[in-house]
Each structure stands twice: as structure tokens, then as C-alpha cells.
């Protein structure tokens, strides 16, 4: 595995204050089940995950979501530069439509939503880091 494609401990939000500092800001984007927050830090990109029992009661589901999110972030980590990104599950998955904790439809749903959300977040980072466009001078 290449070193830059790894997901080391330094690339994760670990402490409560790190999560709190990102949560204080408004959410950037939402999907049907997830919300993403971001905060510039100037250091390397880090990911925080909040996958609570309230919205994913089964441990297998929570672990599946975490694995998919970590992999998606790991592949896009360079796009986030010096930003902390926090991904939060905010809605339950429909048990009738997705009865198994790790069914292929649930896996596909999570992957598509998380990848779409991280793509939007990467565009947001690019937009916020871009220098402001100068207004044309009129004399």
C-alpha cells in the first residue's frame, strides 16, 4: 500500500474537543441519511465519524458505514488539504427496504451517498480556498 493512500491515526479526529470544534460550525451539505461538516486547520486532512446507535442500532450497520466512509475519505484525502471533515449519520435506514445489516442494497446506498457527499465537500473546500475574484475596475 502506498504511504499517501494509507489512513493513519493522524488522519482521524479522535478527541472530544476536535469533534466539538467542527460541530460548532454549520453543516455544509446533506443527503437523505448523512450530514457533512468542515473546518480549516492548516494541518493535514482529518476525518471524524459520528454513527450513533439511535440511527443505526445494529453494530454491523455502524461498522459498515464506518468502513465505507473511511475508504471513500482515504481515496480523496488529498483533495481536503488542511481541513477537518466530520461525517454524521442523521437519519435511520428503512428496515423494511434494507432488512439486513450489511445487505448489498444498504452497502450501495451508503457508498453512493457518502461518495456524493464527500465530492460536494471537496468542491466546497476548493471554493473556500480559492482567492476571491477581483471586481472589474470602472473608471
From Swiss-Prot:
EC primary class: hydrolase
Domain of life per record: Bacteria
Signal peptide (UniProt feature, chain positions): none
EC number: 3.1.26.5
InterPro entries recorded: Ribosomal_Su5_D2-typ_SF, Ribsml_uS5_D2-typ_fold_subgr, RNase_P, RNase_P_CS
Protein's UniProt keywords contain Flavoprotein: no
Family classification: Belongs to the RnpA family.
Name recorded for this polypeptide: Ribonuclease P protein component
Organism: Paraburkholderia xenovorans (strain LB400)
Taxonomic classification: Bacteria, Pseudomonadati, Pseudomonadota, Betaproteobacteria, Burkholderiales
Gene responsible for this protein: rnpA
Amino acid at each position: 500500500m502506498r504511504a499517501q493512500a494509507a489512513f493513519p491515526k493522524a488522519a482521524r479526529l479522535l478527541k472530544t474537543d476536535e469533534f466539538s470544534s467542527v460541530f460548532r460550525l454549520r453543516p455544509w451539505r446533506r443527503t437523505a441519511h448523512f450530514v457533512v461538516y468542515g473546518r480549516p486547520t492548516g494541518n493535514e486532512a482529518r476525518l471524524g465519524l459520528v454513527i450513533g446507535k439511535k440511527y443505526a442500532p445494529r453494530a454491523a450497520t455502524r461498522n459498515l458505514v464506518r468502513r465505507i466512509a473511511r475508504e471513500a475519505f482515504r481515496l480523496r484525502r488529498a483533495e481536503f488539504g488542511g481541513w477537518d471533515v466530520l461525517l454524521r449519520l442523521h437519519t435511520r435506514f428503512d428496515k423494511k427496504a434494507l432488512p439486513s445489516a450489511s445487505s448489498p442494497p444498504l452497502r450501495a446506498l451508503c457508498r453512493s451517498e457518502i461518495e456524493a457527499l464527500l465530492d460536494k465537500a471537496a468542491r466546497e473546500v476548493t471554493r473556500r480556498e480559492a482567492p476571491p475574484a477581483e471586481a472589474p475596475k470602472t473608471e
